[in-house]
Amino acid sequence: MESLQVLVVSMGRKDLSLANKMNFDCSAIIANQTDRCDYISERREYGLVEMYSTDTRGVGVNRNIALAAADAEFILFADDDISYYDGLKRNVLKAFSDEPRADIMVFGVDIVKNGEIAERRRHKDRERRIWNSMRFGTCVMAARREAIERNSIIFNTNFGGGCIYGSGEDSLFLKACFDCGLRVFSSSYVLGTCSKDASSWFTGCNEKYFFDRGALMGYLFPKMPHLMALYFAVNFKKETDIRCKKRISLMLAGLRAGKKLIPYSEYSTEEST
């Protein structure tokens, strides 16, 4: 059994050249969404690199494909815009060795924009609770595979890039981990750089964004979704031209729609008629 596998989600890949760009030093599984279904692999000096290509869509589906194929003791979730610093395997395994209570480990990352580091996301070595973990993205998380498998935890396929609702699969995954009693820790180790020059799915904090966040609140906070939707809309700090009253309206509409998995496209059509 491998000690660590990197589980990468990507799109439109034709070969394994992504492995060189990402600079991992352990076995890896690339889940590649494209227009074909096939499998290729290559044994390298540091481990086996595999790519499962499917004609599926949605980041949650893609992550679940990689997760189902994994067989290592520890798994590190990844996006294809990360480039790891040297010593990845050694440092990830050390983090779990230093904190044997951890089922999930969250790491730091340097955010790159226009070729320069624009933000350094750092964490202290500490245990996390659900209320201070919802901002962590999947691509900085590692896990004990057995803990995930034992509790049948998978990614929600209705949230995230390419899905009905544009984001939130990472928060829902972490919530599922907490709900199952898994323990989440953060590490001071920094994985590498993550390029944020462009996104294939994020189109800004527009009306769809708030609608989708409203739908997410119903799944993240089922006991108090209206309160959390109101809190998010009122305290929103990012740049947007949408006024607070409209943000609240959109989030409450999304909250209602999320119960029936109604997308923003249907809501916006009804609003315009």
PLM feature spans:
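Non-catalytic, C-terminal membrane-associated alpha-helical segments of glycosyltransferases
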Residues: 205-214, 218-273
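Catalytic beta-strand/loop signature of glycosyltransferases that borders the donor
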Residues: 155-157, 181-193, 205-206
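Conserved donor NDP-sugar-binding/catalytic core segment of glycosyltransferases
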Residues: 87-120
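Short aromatic/hydrophobic "clamp" motif used to bind/position activated sugar donors
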Residues: 75
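Short, flexible, basic/aromatic active-site loop/helix in glycosyltransferases
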Residues: 116-146
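Glycine-rich, basic loop-to-helix element that forms the pyrophosphate-binding segment
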Residues: 54-70
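N-proximal low-complexity "stem/linker" segments adjacent to membrane-targeting elements
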Residues: 1-29, 40
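Acidic donor-binding loop at a coil-to-helix junction in glycosyltransferase catalytic cores
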Residues: 160-172
